[in-house]
C-alpha cells in the first residue's frame, strides 16, 4: 500500500513539473524574432577589437591604482571593523544560542577504538 502511495506521489510530482512548462500552440504563430530585431547594422563599422585594445591600458591603470584597503575603507568594510570578541560576547549572552551551543556535537567525546574484544563493538558503537 505504501509503495502505491509513493508511486502516486512521484507521478503527481512529475505532472506538476510538466504543468509548469509553457504550452506552445502552433496556431498562434512562430516564436522566432523578426528580422528587424536581429538587425545590428554593419558590424564592420563597430570595430570593437581596436576600440577595446586602444582603451585597455586606461582600464588597467585605473584598476591598478585602486588598492584593496581603499576599496574596503570607502565602503565601510575595513579589516579592523570586524572584531571577533564582540561577536562572541553578543552570541554567548543570548539564551537560545547559548543553549544550542551546549547541545552541539563539538563537545562530545571522540570515538576511540578498543584494543580488546571486537565482538563488543558494532560499527562505531561499543557496548
UniProtKB/Swiss-Prot annotation:
PROSITE patterns: UROTENSIN_II. This is Urotensin-2. Belongs to the urotensin-2 family. Involved in smooth muscle stimulating and ion mobilizing activities. It has a suggested role as a corticotropin-releasing factor. One of its GO terms (biological process) is blood vessel diameter maintenance. GO terms for cellular component: extracellular region. It comes from the Eukaryota. GO terms for molecular function: hormone activity. Keywords: Cleavage on pair of basic residues, Disulfide bond, Hormone, Secreted, Signal. It comes from Pelophylax ridibundus (Marsh frog). It is found in: Secreted. The keyword GTP-binding does not apply. Disulfide bonds join 121-126. Residues 1-16 form the signal peptide. Central nervous system. Spinal cord. Residues 17-111 form a propeptide. The keyword Transport does not apply.
Amino acid at each position: 500500500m505504501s509503495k502505491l502511495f509513493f508511486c502516486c506521489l512521484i507521478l503527481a510530482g512529475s505532472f506538476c513539473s510538466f504543468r509548469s512548462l509553457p504550452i506552445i500552440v502552433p496556431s498562434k504563430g512562430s516564436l522566432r524574432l523578426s528580422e528587424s530585431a536581429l538587425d545590428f547594422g554593419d558590424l564592420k563599422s563597430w570595430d570593437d577589437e581596436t576600440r577595446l585594445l586602444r582603451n585597455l591600458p586606461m582600464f588597467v591603470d585605473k584598476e591598478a591604482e585602486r588598492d584593496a584597503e581603499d576599496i574596503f575603507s570607502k565602503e565601510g568594510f575595513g579589516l579592523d571593523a570586524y572584531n571577533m570578541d564582540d561577536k562572541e560576547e553578543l552570541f554567548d549572552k543570548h539564551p537560545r544560542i547559548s543553549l544550542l551551543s551546549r547541545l552541539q556535537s563539538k563537545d562530545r567525546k571522540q570515538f576511540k577504538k578498543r584494543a580488546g574484544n571486537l565482538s563488543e563493538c558494532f560499527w562505531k558503537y561499543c557496548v
